[in-house]
């Protein structure tokens, strides 16, 4: 089994509150929301992949460099809400890009 974490949304409804920060990287106490998810996922010891969009990809890479969670981050290529793939599209993208042929645990990053 492998895990895919979907984090390629643009948070348009939260934009005024978050600025240009993905919802998954919003502070939650001394960590960010995604850290809380990864702490729980670490107990399962599954290969884990996060699907980001192009706008937030670098922010997720910077988070990973500091947090050092074992997760592969892939960019779905979308650059704005108008060309986003959507949840099902991002899932299909990840399965195809990573050539996955296994059971999957699918999670939303937020």
What are these model-derived regions, one by one?
Residues 2-5, 13, 27, 31-108:
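Conserved N-terminal catalytic core of the sugar/cofactor nucleotidyltransferase
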Residues 15-17:
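Glycine/threonine-rich flexible loop motifs
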């Amino acid at each position: 089994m492998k895990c895919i974490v979907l984090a390629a949304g643009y948070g348009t409804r939260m934009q005024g509150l978050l600025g240009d920060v993905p919802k998954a990287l919003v502070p939650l106490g001394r960590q960010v929301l995604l850290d809380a998810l990864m702490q729980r996922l670490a107990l399962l010891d599954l290969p884990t992949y996060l699907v980001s969009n192009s706008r937030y990809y670098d922010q997720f890479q910077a988070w990973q460099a500091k947090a050092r969670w074992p997760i592969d981050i892939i960019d779905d290529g979308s650059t704005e809400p108008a060309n986003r793939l959507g949840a099902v599209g991002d899932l299909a993208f990840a399965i195809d890009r990573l050539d996955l042929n296994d059971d999957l645990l699918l999670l939303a990053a937020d």
